[in-house]
Amino acid sequence: TIVEYELTWLPEGFSFQKEQDLSNSTYLTYANDSGQRILFSYLEGNDATSLFMAADYTEVQSVQIGNINADFYQASQETSPNGLVWVSEEENMCFCITASLPKDTIIKVAEGIQKNNQKNF
């Protein structure tokens, strides 16, 4: 069974919209009333490139999420979302958050990720 993860902290006004399960990856979409979106995705393994295309990014910064190193991709245009990508070795999972939000906010969202084993079918 695939482990489920969820965001426990969201910026004000954001709420969960939908979940999309693909063969080995999961995409969760959160949005606010003005149409801004946070996309949280994760998959088993360490191939983060399949979650995230780092094409139109001007700058990559190393940041910390707790004790895990992550890459923050600063979008080159205001209209493009920023991205945060990291791999958890112990979970053998990689994670990605993309949102048109400031770096500090996206990191705070990432720090609130919780494993959710209470999956009710």
Residue ranges and their predicted role:
Residues E90-F121:
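Surface-exposed amphipathic alpha-helical segments
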Residues T1-E90:
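Short, solvent-exposed recognition patches
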